[in-house]
């Protein structure tokens, strides 16, 4: 069986380097292209060297069109604006678009929806199996408990994290809202400061923290005299590339 040819965009980033390593270790796929933004110091370098490995014979390019044309799929953990552009380009050439980019707004998601009409698009706020299992558990618990139980989504990430709440936190919040048969945006509360008054029944709170960890997430269901906590701890960034 032939190997799946994959392009990694944002190749010099944390997840980009992790993905390049993961592809090298998977016999079912091969790195056919590596893309970085124009002006990046990584452009022209061997993608293997960029990822901290031996040479792989694939040079990092700033021309995604040519890289996509020779691929079966693109792995994308970049920025919302870049992801929107890559999605349109992937649709043009007819390849799979796997999206782990976080911090996207409706305008960005609309581009993914449009692309999904013609190509397979896989998108998640977090690609780890553990977080997605946690989301399923959160949905079930939220469905069982009544609205008198307060829900808080707590998280900690490395200090270079640029979006908050994270995609994983929003995924968990959406799972809690789904369990309560409601919409997250109608009950979302991010951060509290000053005199806020009593908590509104049914709200779902978010409290992001800085640190040096890959990603810790905890969902707390706080009731009268009892508390239920469900959590997931990411110990290695490579789990997002599995």
Swiss-Prot record:
Catalytic activity: (S)-2,3,4,5-tetrahydrodipicolinate + NAD(+) + H2O = (2S,4S)-4-hydroxy-2,3,4,5-tetrahydrodipicolinate + NADH + H(+); (S)-2,3,4,5-tetrahydrodipicolinate + NADP(+) + H2O = (2S,4S)-4-hydroxy-2,3,4,5-tetrahydrodipicolinate + NADPH + H(+)
UniProt-annotated binding residues for NADP(+): 37
Residue numbers binding (S)-2,3,4,5-tetrahydrodipicolinate: 158
Active site: residue positions: 157, 161
Places the protein is found: Cytoplasm
EC annotation from Swiss-Prot or TrEMBL: 1.17.1.8
Biological processes annotated in GO: diaminopimelate biosynthetic process; lysine biosynthetic process via diaminopimelate
Keywords: Amino-acid biosynthesis, Cytoplasm, Diaminopimelate biosynthesis, Lysine biosynthesis, NAD, NADP, Oxidoreductase, Plasmid
UniProt binding sites for NAD(+): 10-15, 36, 100-102, 124-127
Known pathway: Amino-acid biosynthesis; L-lysine biosynthesis via DAP pathway; (S)-tetrahydrodipicolinate from L-aspartate: step 4/4
UniProt keyword annotation of Membrane present: no
Coiled-coil residue windows: none
Presence of keyword Amino-acid biosynthesis: yes
Gene Ontology molecular function: 4-hydroxy-tetrahydrodipicolinate reductase
Major subcellular location class: cytoplasm
UniProt xrefs under CDD domains: DHDPR_N
InterPro entries named among the record's database cross-references: DapB_C, DapB_N, DapB_N_CS, DHDPR_bac, NAD(P)-bd_dom_sf
GO cellular component, one term: cytosol
Family: Belongs to the DapB family.
Classification via PANTHER family: 4-HYDROXY-TETRAHYDRODIPICOLINATE REDUCTASE 1, CHLOROPLASTIC-RELATED, DIHYDRODIPICOLINATE REDUCTASE
Function: Catalyzes the conversion of 4-hydroxy-tetrahydrodipicolinate (HTPA) to tetrahydrodipicolinate.
Name of the protein in its database record: 4-hydroxy-tetrahydrodipicolinate reductase
Organism: Rhizobium meliloti
Gene of this entry: dapB
């Amino acid at each position: 069986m032939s190997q799946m040819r994959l392009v990694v965009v944002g190749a010099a980033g944390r997840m980009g380097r992790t993905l390049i390593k993961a592809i090298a270790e998977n016999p079912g796929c091969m790195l056919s292209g590596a893309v970085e933004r124009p002006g990046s110091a990584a452009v022209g370098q061997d993608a293997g060297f960029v990822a901290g490995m031996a040479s792989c014979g694939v040079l990092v390019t700033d021309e995604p069109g040519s890289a996509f044309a020779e691929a079966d799929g693109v792995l994308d953990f970049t920025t919302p604006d870049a992801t929107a552009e890559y999605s349109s380009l992937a649709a043009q050439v007819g390849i799979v678009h796997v999206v782990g980019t976080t911090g996207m707004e409706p305008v960005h998601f609309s581009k993914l929806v449009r692309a999904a009409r013609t190509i397979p698009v896989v998108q998640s706020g977090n690609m780890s199996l553990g977080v997605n299992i946690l989301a399923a558990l959160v949905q079930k618990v939220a469905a069982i408990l009544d609205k008198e139980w307060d829900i808080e989504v707590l998280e900690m990430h490395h200090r270079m994290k640029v979006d908050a709440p994270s995609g994983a936190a929003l995924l968990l919040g959406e799972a809690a809202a789904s369990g309560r048969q409601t919409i997250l945006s109608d009950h979302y509360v991010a951060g509290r400061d000053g005199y806020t008054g009593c908590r509104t029944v049914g709200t779902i709170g978010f409290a992001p923290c800085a640190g040096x960890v890959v990603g810790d997430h905890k969902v707390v269901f706080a009731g009268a005299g009892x508390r239920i906590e469900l959590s997931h701890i990411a110990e290695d960034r490579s789990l997002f590339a599995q």
